Amino acid sequence: MWGPGVTAEGLSVAPAPPPLLPLLLLLALALVAPSRGGGGCAELACGERERCCDSANATAVRCCKLPLHAFLDNVGWFVRKLSGLLILLVLFAIGYFLQRIICPSPRRYPRGQARPGQARPGPPGGAGPPGTAGPPDDDDDSPALLRDEVAAGSQDSLLDSGGGRGRGSGGRLPPSCVSEHELHVVSPVFLQLPSYEEVKYLPTYEESMRLQQLSPAEVVLPVSVLGRPRGGSAGDSDGGQVRFPLI
């Protein structure tokens, strides 16, 4: 015969742990037993959650709450006092998470790192491929980059696009080719509305849509907008008809 903890092969095995059910029963009895109340204290009848307790006067007997219920009452009183602050904290947390979900913070790129889809220029000498070297970029909110973005967005207007096609450029100018004077003109800080004399010769929307379907050699503005050409002299004419650049 083998002793406890030893198998037939001679290998020692740890003994089985004691069952947890008796321990749980003892713990439940320990928690429930102090909670029992009721009964009487001499001539006093205590409630369900009360018991007899001695006071300073040995002859006086009174009923007092059980320790567990007294602790729960104290916790409830403390929570009621701080309920307003707790509600404010919960509302603040909910609003903060909703703001982070609806309005995420913009992605910031460190210095020297180009944005996705924007290649960094190479060195002036041409050593190395573009996008791998060059001076570190400024922050996204620097005034120079802000002016470049405003200048690039302003090229979508009718006047800028018309001037580029009239000069035969056939496309937009990059922000690096824009002069400082044009940057001040298109900047929101220095942006001013044109006068009537500068825009009274511009065609209407319908006329401009018809002009886009014609070649530059066939473009002749209607009689309603004939007059002094924009950027030209009054004597410039071709066979009695004044030709205007395509707007």
From Swiss-Prot:
Membrane-spanning segments: 82-102
Protein name as it appears in the record: Uncharacterized membrane protein C3orf80 homolog
Pfam families reported for this sequence: DUF4719
GO cellular component, one term: membrane
Annotated spans, Disordered: 109-176
Principal place of residence: membrane
Signal peptide, first to last residue: 1-35
Skewed-composition ranges (Low complexity): 111-120
Compositional bias segments (type: Gly residues): 161-171
Membrane topology field: Single-pass membrane protein
Cell compartment(s), UniProt: Membrane
UniProt key word Transferase: no
Record's keyword annotation contains Protease: no
Keyword line: Membrane, Signal, Transmembrane, Transmembrane helix
Superkingdom of the organism of origin: Eukaryota
